[in-house]
Regions:
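Intrinsically disordered, low-complexity terminal regions
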Residues: 1-211
């Protein structure tokens, strides 16, 4: 999902099969099973504990929060953060524009984690594909593992005000990136901080490394 940002802007508004709520939040109680996509504009999505959502969660101008031991498919948010509790399973991607992404220990994200203008802060989490950012910092803690790469994409793909020149990537507490860390613009100032005990098994390209 190398150019996820442009695709998400389109898909968020053309959402076949979604029941779209406007100016209203969606709350799924503990232990519920949901067999549909959840999509709201100017509202948030809250999924309780031990839930199973066989659909995507999409929000414009609102946040997404998934509580402990729940399972969902793709998570997409414009102008809002994504918060994941303990032992959450995401059977797809987690994507934000203008919002942070955070997770608690035991969480597994099967796809990519992607953010514009927001920090990615993962604790004890497995990402089975890539982490992609344009201007947000990335922090991996508590033995988090990224099976793919970390990529800092080029600026200016869309009008997203993401032209921040400095990005910090910090790996702590024995966290590991199995692939590469790739900065796609040589004039972007990116620091990879491994002083907290993290490892990158692949290459680090176009970034300063602190050991």
């Amino acid at each position: 999902m190398r150019h996820v940002y442009l695709g998400f802007v389109f898909l968020a508004f053309v959402c076949a099969g979604c029941n779209i709520e406007v100016n209203k939040s969606i709350e799924i109680g503990n232990d519920e099973h949901v067999q549909k996509n959840l999509f709201t504009v100017n509202g948030s999505i809250q999924v309780g504990k031990r839930c199973q959502v066989n659909g995507d969660c999409r929000v414009v101008n609102g946040s997404i929060a998934i509580d402990d031991d729940s399972q969902v498919r793709d998570l997409n948010s414009i102008n809002g953060r994504i918060s994941l509790g303990k032992k959450v399973t995401i059977r797809g991607d987690a994507v934000t524009i203008n919002g942070a992404i955070s997770s608690e220990p035991g969480t597994v994200i099967s796809g990519d984690v992607s953010s514009i203008n927001g920090e990615v802060d993962l604790r004890g989490t497995e990402v089975r594909k890539d982490i992609i950012t344009k201007s947000g910092d990335i922090i991996l803690r508590n033995r988090s593992i990224v099976r793919g790469d970390i990529r800092v994409d080029k600026r200016g793909l869309i009008n997203d005000n993401s032209n921040r020149l400095y990005v910090n990537i910090r790996l702590a507490d024995d966290s590991v990136v199995e692939g590469d860390i790739i900065v796609e613009e040589k004039d972007r100032e990116v620091t990879v901080d491994l002083r907290g005990g993290g490892k990158v098994l692949g290459e680090i390209r176009n970034a300063e490394v602190l050991r």
